[in-house]
């Protein structure tokens, strides 16, 4: 579809009357997002994103609304869709629409609507100007532009990617020689992956399961599939609730970390039959298969906190046992296998946004401050980059962390000149080499 044949739709949300509620929650979130608010204050006069038309595809939550309005405060025009069919908070989408921003998102999208919403973000206003920047989470927007709208690519200065799955897709494109613009990998900034992925999941994983099921977690046997940053936060989340946690892993380093953090590390086949809750965190496909479902005990809860729904073999489950499916409530479904009930949360999609409201505002401020800095960097300096995947430099990573310290009452020591010289760093940083692993 070309610009000329795509009609202008100002917005599409579930219920615009929710805007006042959403605005109150946005104002509350702003107080917990010091990084974004600091960037608004720092750049309000400079307007570093003036002229940028940023199409965003990222969970349309209250916290994302603060990001959107930060990008606009820095001079950008913005359109938005959600990267997950269940993750939109309808009051947030309504508030953004009421502010005159093109947003296309509501909770409970079907797949055709999901694609339609992304497509609407490619063109701006009634004059249908095309996007010139991408802000993505998972790669669906990026892939749509490159694969279905290649004529738009030349006008795009760059893209920033939020999550592990999307970054993996970008590196696949680099390897295949099909990435046509520079990209910044926001996910692997220290202040994203070690905070959003870990500390965010530490709070939101348990929150989602509790809201969905009202189950008592203390004493329950939980299997966490994967022990990367998301898995680490998820395992800690359930252990903090008193659950007995077992981890599964393919990576010997992550497996050793899990063991030395005090978790048993076992093969899924050996523990699936005794688990009360199984949660996937890997970013890979086909983790929980039909053979695993057949071993599960009655009332096992199965969910996923990775980006896509293919970590759990929902296709097998629906093909073989779909006739038994009963919706308990939205995003909580019961399947019956050989007389045993299995509870699936959020249809195998991202459980913390499908069954709850995702990560807390403060930790999302870390991630979204990185996103904002990445957009500024690519918009102002895209000519300095090749068609490859880049990281934000260390000094910006440290800046993101610094902007969040005062909110927590943190006081930093200051290096003397001789101390800085002794360890080979500047008095004002960066304080660690690029290869340092936090």
UniProtKB/Swiss-Prot annotation:
Binds 1 NAD(+) per subunit. Disulfide bonds: none annotated. GO terms for biological process: L-homocysteine biosynthetic process; one-carbon metabolic process; S-adenosylmethionine cycle. Its EC number is 3.13.2.1. GO terms for molecular function: adenosylhomocysteinase activity. Pathway: Amino-acid biosynthesis; L-homocysteine biosynthesis; L-homocysteine from S-adenosyl-L-homocysteine: step 1/1. It comes from the Bacteria. Its main location: cytoplasm. Belongs to the adenosylhomocysteinase family. This is Adenosylhomocysteinase. It comes from Flavobacterium psychrophilum (strain ATCC 49511 / DSM 21280 / CIP 103535 / JIP02/86). The gene is ahcY.
